[in-house]
Amino acid sequence: MLLCPVCHEPLVDDERGAACAGGHRFDRAREGYLYLLRSSKSGDAMGEPKSQARSRRDFLNRGYYAPLRDAMVELVREQVSGRATSTGSPMTLLDICCGEGYYTSAMGAVPGVDAYGFDLGKEMVRLAAKRGDATFFVANMKDIPVADGAFDMVTELFAPFNEREFSRVLAPEGSLFTVVPGARHLFGLKEVLYDTPYLNDEKLPQTTELELVGTQRVSANITLQTQADIEAVFQMTPYYYRTRPADKERLANLDTLQTDIDFIIAEYRHR
């Protein structure tokens, strides 16, 4: 299933971690994850800072995005019940850019699923491994260290879309589920930040190797209960980095915030 990131030979588990026939060894961290990057420095230097990773974990643990989590879990259940193998072996799932594992562990807890998740940030994967219900590893989505066609289900939520790698790791009859923000996602946040708030462009990935077979909208209205929650969700958005300091101050003065959450789940399969 997993490949050596150096020579791309299969990795074999042992007591300490995993190794390939080429002699490359990867130790398992205390939390249980594998570090599958070529450079030992990349995982610390890339990804979100520790404080931001923990803030995101705490935000998600409060259940604000539970509607999306539950929708993803239900899709996985449907896949398992509708395409169960005659051998009785579990269906494999890969969560790309899994972050701190909130969605991965929920999907991995579905009976009949063997889940894997990876992220570029070591702190994210460390937190994810503590959740359990999946095999976690640090890796780069530009060169995913897994075998061709190894996964019956591939999921990616809000990550850049790498069609070459996503289609490579997806099994011939598998399904890829990608999640993008809906038009009104966090519109209440934008109403505070901007004088003229705008709707998101619901742009689904355009593909050549994969075919869009269906979409599903998940939406709800939530009330963020603390300033920490408001700041955490703001940091999870791309406009956190391009909003003027004066506009950020508007959020800093709020203790609660009501807003829509809005997601589009799109399913792709091989053409």
Where are these regions (language model features)?
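Class I SAM-dependent methyltransferase Rossmann-like catalytic core
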Residues: 47-71, 75
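A short acidic, Gly/Pro-enriched loop at the edge of an enzyme's catalytic core
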Residues: 142-153
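Class I SAM-dependent methyltransferase SAM/SAH-binding core
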Residues: 92-143
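N-terminal auxiliary segments of SAM/dcSAM-dependent transferases
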Residues: 1-46
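Conserved beta-strand signature within the Rossmann-like core of class I S-adenosyl-L-methionine
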Residues: 173-183
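Conserved Class I S-adenosyl-L-methionine
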Residues: 190-212, 218-271
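A short SAM/SAH-binding and catalytic strip from SAM-dependent methyltransferases
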Residues: 151-165, 180-182
